[in-house]
Amino acid sequence: MKRFAAVSLAALMLLTVFASAASAADVIEIRGPVYNGSDINDIIDTYGENNALTIDATKFAAFYYDIDDNVTTETLSILAVPGTEGNVIGEGGIVYETTIQQVDYEFYRPAAGWSNYSLIGFFAEKYIPINPDKADKLAKLVLDSDDKYTIRTGEQLDLGEGYSIEAKQVDVDGEKVWLEFTKDGEFVDDEIISVVSGSDNTWEVELDDIQDEDDVVVLRVHVNQVFQGAVDSIAQIEGLWLIDYTNAMKIESDDEFGNLDNVKINGDTLTITNEDTFTLTRDDEEEIAEGLFFKTADDTRALRFYAMKQITEPGTYEIRGEVAEGDFSWDATNFAGFFYDVNDDVSTESLTVTGLNGGNVIPEGGLVYETTIQMVDYEYSKPSVGWDQFPVLGFFAEEYIPINADKADKLAKLVLDSDDKYTIRTGEQLDLGEGYAIEAKQVDVDGEKVWLEFTKDGEFVDDEIISVVSGSDNTWEVELDDIQDEDDVVVLRVHVNQVFQGAVDSIAQIEGIWLIDYANAMKIESDDEFGDLDNVKINGATLTITNEDTFTLTRDDEVEIGQGMFFKVADTAASDLRYYPFVEKTIDGEVVDDDEDDDNVTEPVDNDTEVEEPTEEPTEGPTEEPTEGPTTEEPTEEPTEADGTTPGFGVVLGLVGLLAVVYLVRRNN
């Protein structure tokens, strides 16, 4: 019996070691249109044409898109080739194609040589072809900016990916600046740039032997002004463009990209297809190539899927809807920002624009946001033990739970809905996110019960003893009163899978957690305003918000709709209109900085005024991807490690426990 206990403890310890050693990063999923049909051929017939279903950047927010120039480069197609049937795509039936296009510099000054450049999207990333008309040699675009940056002599401007420029000196007349370009602190090139009348003020760095190509422009810098002051010498830069030439790549015909392995290069066009069949496995994510996936629903009655891109790098990302040119309507199938449950095929939100009549002004009541409560399955779906469904409401692209299942007026954000397994020792806390945690206080001597405690910001909320003996449902529901004047509100559900009382440790295994942020629950009133949406109507399970005043889609601007949702409008002629809705999602964390020596690095801030003697240190510099701006608090999809504690065993403690088990076994022998 002792040997059995020791072996059982060892198994659970091993599970815990691996659970605590692996840390799940936050992930943003950018999805394409949702396709739903009886099988793949039905979907191609319904959504495609000429035996082909094609997705481009106007529909798939992950693909590169320039709204001002209306430029796309990438398409992903599914073809009705032989072998395409059921949920299987035949050989050559997946076609990824991208073609070089010309786009304007952000710093658009054609008279000064800043007009346009060649760009190609490559698996939802922006690349620059080394040869403007050949798609075989590519370097990632690091920076394309028209912001103004002011740097003192001796200071560096961090451009990202380890690249930087430094203002070495300014001449005594304040007409020239000596700039130096470095990579990972190593000298690359330098130049003296003049800003006197008649100069183009632009420095182009050309390098040789970039994938066997010479005279490759890797950096462009436009110096706006130079100032020689009594205290400081400074240069103002407006216009930066940079490629990651050190990691340039050459694409060969025998290269493979995930499940796409048949590569064809025809001048400015790159085409990659699948040589083998591709199965859309239900309830799974199948990688197409380079971080692009097909996500397929867990539904045996139909085939439902979408293409998507997974992002894990820290930063703030724009998630857009389908591009419109007039009156239009978006829901979760064509706006990736809206809540969508692919398994249950459930969406709740819609956004509609009517009454434009060829102009860019939406009349009163012409902008309508509507959302309706729907039922979805728990991630831990076990109807036999009470884990079947719960009500959900998308609210401005966030997932909320109605306090009353059939009323859309009182909402709390969903923090967690998980079917992952977590193993915690007595005395340890499991961080659930947003300041919520549960702790295993004690396990009974028979290993059949566990005492759990629920806290918020370290303060006691509730506790319970959960039994796992046969016949118990093993689920703890925390019900609280006075949540927006409602009583008996379920705020937490926890399913305890196993309890173990060992010779070394007492542990509990949890599988199934559901939590709402009840502490920040809100009530929506009819006189509330959400940005420019200020006419609120609540009709049972449906919430409708419209505009009481006219709403102008200002060209070359981002216009807030409400609650962090915007329209981005293209810089077009007055006779044209092009726009899309978007939200921003943020992955927290520090962006990796290749330059570890920060003592002499200043990241300048934008400066829209004439250069004067600076009184403060500039504080910010350009990055490839925006890291500031409106951030969206996202529900935590998985519990994370609390500060100072680890859910489950740490690796070291786990190993110590294993050694103890070995000792017990040897002693009993």
Curated annotation (Swiss-Prot):
Q: Where is this region: Disordered?
A: 588-648
Keywords linked to the UniProt accession: Cell membrane, Cell wall, Cell wall biogenesis/degradation, Glycoprotein, Membrane, S-layer, Secreted, Signal, Transmembrane, Transmembrane helix
The signal peptide stretch is 1-24
InterPro entries reported for this sequence: PGF_CTERM, S_layer-rel_Mac
**TM region(s), chain numbering:** 645-665
Please cite one Gene Ontology biological process associated with this protein.
Answer: cell wall organization
Q: Provide the Gene Ontology terms for cellular component.
A: extracellular region; plasma membrane; S-layer
PTM: Glycosylated.
Family annotation (Pfam families): PGF-CTERM, S-layer
* Primary localization: secreted
Q: Where on this protein are sugars attached?
A: N36, N70, N116, N600, N607
Give the highest taxon in the source lineage. Answer: Archaea
Which residue windows does the record flag with biased composition (Acidic residues)? 590-627
Task: List localization entries.
Answer: Secreted, Cell wall, S-layer; Cell membrane
Which family would the database say this protein is a member of? Belongs to the Methanosarcinales S-layer protein family.
Tell me, in a sentence or two, what this protein's role is: S-layer protein. The S-layer is a paracrystalline mono-layered assembly of proteins which coat the surface of the cell.
User: What protein is this chain from?
Assistant: Major S-layer protein
The organism's taxonomy opens as:
Archaea, Methanobacteriati, Methanobacteriota, Stenosarchaea group, Methanomicrobia
